[in-house]
From Swiss-Prot:
Entry annotated with the keyword Cytoplasm: yes
Species: Homo sapiens
PTM sites of type N6-methyllysine: 773
A GO MF term: ATP-dependent protein folding chaperone
Modified positions (Phosphothreonine) in chain numbering: 538
Biased composition regions of type Basic and acidic residues, renumbered to the chain: 514-533, 788-799, 829-840
Protein name in UniProt: Heat shock 70 kDa protein 4
Phosphoserine modified-residue sites: 76, 393, 415, 546, 647, 756
Disulfide linkage: none
């Protein structure tokens, strides 16, 4: 079973796998552990990753990058509107209202959803993992930013399904970093001790995330998160791009932003310049040849000037840091360490801002690029039954408060209740109780839209079906279970109706008003399968939840007044009936469409595979032409006649011309046939050359064998002690085989020496190998017979038996030795225990 963690980044992706030796970040086909989040669409296939990155400028309109933030977003979303101007490719509104990506693929215009494009990237990462692991990859853990909303998370989950992956968990990037940090720490405080608080700062290419985590031995608890969803490395790149656009506009009279290819080239150069400035404070040049209209451009920049230009961006570093401390009510002194990850944290000014805020040195014990994917792989190993990993519990948080709204018959309007507060533990379940006579709808939404980096606070609508009144016409008790799951996705996971069956019992005491109130009071039960500490509800929450009944508290008093005052207490039996729930999720892809996307992805993978095979077949022909042409005038020259060489060379030249003309775009089989045709002419020449190389070595080996056996025969005839135990008949057999082999070798050597090198050899290397094997199998068993052992005289054996070991210490130890043996250390069970985990 494979265990894979995927860091799905805005600019680049990483894949880590868990193996017996530990967690390993794997390299792609270019021997690079970083795979660009880039897809290029061509007339016959798709290029994904590094191959697509090289086409960003040459195939700008059909090369897609920076699509991560379009997940779960409508085309009319303000974020999408703002991004349009930065994109080289076109985005369109899909029939569902979501953002689609428009490209030309297979010679026709196609609109792909963000989920489909992400699935293409995931398929590539899956293929990379499979090529390293040499087995299928299905189970994985994928990272997402901690600020992703429900719609965005569901969108990424759909993308994993399209790619044929089973995502065990969508893991917040900061939580993955915290896991990678904490699981290997041996010095964490015990569970009963005060936890160690660590701040994790992750500034990547597109976003800035901060989290505070509390660590105890075997336990990680996220306390709070904060973020700036648009502050990242690309914002610093944009500052440089805008500066040079303005400078080159004045200096060279160029309107750079009017040409997307020029803008892309400038962006690439500015990113390189930014990285150089992180290591150098001196003036650095930026030069681009034939930039626009065949004009060469150049400029300079230094770190000091760059930081002045970035003052507005640097001012945005502190607020999230301050926010997490305020949310957790921690002081700066309570923070044990500040770990930084992400490419943009390498900018010296960013590091300085963070360090100055906390008043301490920053910790860089984690790999800034690979920490997220390593954390995801560790989480996958924890979830997988195939690996034994030390116990480590992870409690995440809900980033935004989630509320439910419903129509309240008693209040003749809508009621609402906050079910999960900001930074509530997750995954988490709660059971809400409603009193209803008919089906009802719950509307889930984020209750603080001002904190949401998303225009629509709605999450989903959940309709609880088949609710009926009790047999006496009263409202039924409906228990609804709401949950934030391991992916951070909210759902109404189940609903059940409590059926009450009553039978009058005269001897039972009368029901009091107090009993009725107690029955109605309990409205919210909390289930906590993944969280160790029970969270207490605040009075405000209790108040809100007590209003979930059909009537308010005042209404319940009125209701009791309508009942007969002398009603006898009934013997109550209850049973529960599961109720169906209809979900209306925001921007959710329906199952039928998802299956279509899965089918289309399979077709595109097959098309890519066929095109790769076709290209490989074409390249094989081209490679063979160049190889044979060089060798015909080189090492193969002596092994082909002049006429044959001339005709073959002409054939090779014709094939080369054909490849660049009529053979430019042919089916795979045409190239396979063409290569076979060339090999029919070239293979005999190649074989003659190989035979001339191998034959002398093998004849030499055969000669050595013959010489060795002749010496042994001579020694036997001279009656030397070493061979006097051998049988004369057997040695005659050896002599006969050796003489036959010598005669065969001399005969073949003479014939071969008379044969021209341009002709096929008289004897092939395989025949010589067979002769060596035949000679060895006949002679070796005979000459390697060991001499028979000579038994010593009986008297000597008797004396040897009488001479026992000194002091009686021999094979049978005496009582003293046995006593000593009892004191020797025996390995205890604890010493024999397996290590806690098999991942270093």
């Amino acid at each position: 079973m494979s265990v894979v963690g995927i860091d799905l980044g805005f600019q680049s992706c990483y894949v880590a796998v868990a193996r017996a030796g530990g967690i390993e970040t794997i390299a792609n086909e270019y021997s690079d552990r970083c795979t660009p989040a880039c897809i290029s669409f061509g007339p016959k296939n798709r290029s994904i990753g590094a191959a697509a990155k090289s086409q960003v400028i040459s195939n700008a309109k059909n090369t897609v990058q920076g699509f991560k933030r379009f997940h779960g977003r409508a085309f009319s979303d303000p974020f999408v509107e703002a991004e349009k101007s930065n994109l080289a490719y076109d985005i369109v509104q899909l029939p569902t209202g979501l953002t689609g990506i428009k490209v030309t693929y297979m010679e026709e215009e196609r609109n792909f959803t963000t989920e489909q494009v992400t699935a293409m990237l995931l398929s590539k990462l899956k293929e990379t993992a499979e090529s390293v692991l040499k087995k299928p990859v299905v189970d994985c853990v994928v990272s997402v930013p901690c600020f992703y909303t429900d719609a965005e998370r569901r969108s990424v989950m759909d993308a994993t399904q399209i790619a044929g992956l089973n995502c065990l968990r969508l893991m917040n990037e900061t939580t993955a970093v915290a896991l990678a940090y904490g699981i290997y720490k041996q010095d964490l405080p015990a569970l009963e001790e005060k936890p160690r608080n660590v701040v994790f700062v992750d500034m990547g290419h597109s976003a800035y995330q901060v989290s505070v985590c509390a660590f105890n031995r075997g336990k990680l608890k996220v306390l709070a998160t904060a973020f700036d969803t648009t502050l990242g490395g690309r914002k610093f790149d944009e500052v440089l791009v805008n500066h040079f656009c303005e400078e080159f506009g004045k200096k060279y009279k160029l309107d750079i932003k009017s040409k997307i290819r020029a803008l892309l080239r400038l962006s690439q150069e500015c990113e390189k310049l930014k990285k150089l400035m992180s290591a150098n404070a001196s003036d650095l040049p930026l030069s681009i040849e034939c930039f626009m209209n065949d004009v060469d451009v150049s400029g300079t920049m230094n770190r000091g000037k760059f930081l002045e230009m970035c003052n507005d961006l640097l001012a945005r570093v502190e607020p999230p840091l301050r926010s997490v401390l305020e949310q957790t009510k921690l002081k700066k002194e309570d923070i044990y360490a500040v770990e930084i990850v992400g490419g943009a944290t390498r900018i010296p000014a960013v590091k300085e801002k963070i360090s100055k805020f906390f008043g301490k040195e920053l910790s860089t014990t984690l790999n800034a690029d690979e920490a997220v994917t390593r954390g995801c792989a560790l989480q996958c190993a924890i979830l997988s039954p195939a690996f034994k990993v030390r116990e480590f519990s992870i409690t995440d948080v809900v980033p935004y408060p989630i509320s439910l709204r419903w129509n309240s018959p008693a209040e003749e309007g809508s009621s609402d209740c906050e079910v999960f507060s900001k930074n509530h533990a997750a995954p988490f379940s709660k059971v809400l109780t409603f009193y209803r006579k008919e089906p009802f709808t719950l509307e889930a939404y984020y209750s603080s839209p001002q904190d949401l980096p998303y225009p629509d606070p709605a999450i989903a609508q959940f309709s609880v079906q088949k609710v009926t009144p009790q047999s006496d016409g009263s409202s039924s008790k409906v228990k609804v279970k709401v949950r934030v799951n391991v992916h951070g996705i909210f759902s109404v996971s189940s609903a059940s109706l409590v059926e009450v069956h009553k039978s009058e019992e005269n001897e039972e005491p009368m029901e009091t008003d107090q009993n009725a109130k107690e029955e109605e009071k309990m409205q919210v039960d909390q289930e906590e399968p993944h969280v160790e500490e029970q969270q207490q509800q605040t009075p405000a929450e209790n108040k809100a939840e007590s209003e979930e009944m059909e009537t308010s508290q005042a209404g319940s008093k009125d209701k009791k007044m309508d009942q007969p005052p002398q009603a006898k207490k009934a013997k109550v039996k209850t049973s529960t009936v599961d109720l169906p729930i209809e979900n209306q999720l925001l921007w959710q892809i329906d199952r039928e469409m998802l299956n279509l996307y899965i089918e289309n992805e399979g077709k595109m993978i097959m098309q890519d595979k066929l095109e790769k095979e076709r290209n490989d077949a074409k390249n094989a022909v081209e490679e063979y032409v160049y190889e044979m042409r060089d060798k015909l005038s080189g090492e193969y020259e002596k092994f082909v006649s002049e006429d044959d060489r001339n005709s073959f060379t002409l054939k090779l030249e014709d094939t080369e011309n054909w490849l660049y003309e009529d053979g430019e775009d042919q089916p795979k089989q045409v190239y396979v046939d063409k290569l076979a045709e060339l090999k029919n002419l070239g293979q005999p020449i190649k074989i003659r050359f190989q035979e001339s190389e191998e034959r002398p070595k093998l004849f030499e080996e055969l000669g050595k064998q013959i010489q060795q056996y002749m010496k042994i025969i001579s020694s036997f005839k001279n009656k030397e002690d070493q061979y006097d135990h051998l049988d004369a008949a057997d040695m005659t057999k050896v002599e006969k085989s050796t003489n036959e082999a010598m005669e065969w070798m001399n005969n073949k050597l003479n014939l071969q020496n008379k044969q021209s090198l341009t002709m096929d050899p008289v004897v092939k290397s395989k025949e010589i190998e067979a002769k060596i094997k035949e000679l060895t199998s006949t002679c070796s068993p005979i000459i390697s017979k060991p001499k028979p052992k000579v038994e010593p005289p009986k008297e000597e054996q008797k004396n040897a038996e009488q001479n026992g070991p000194v002091d009686g210490q021999g094979d049978n130890p005496g009582p003293q030795a046995a006593e000593q043996g009892t004191d020797t250390a025996v390995p205890s069970d604890s010493d024999k225990k397996l290590p806690e985990m098999d991942i270093d």
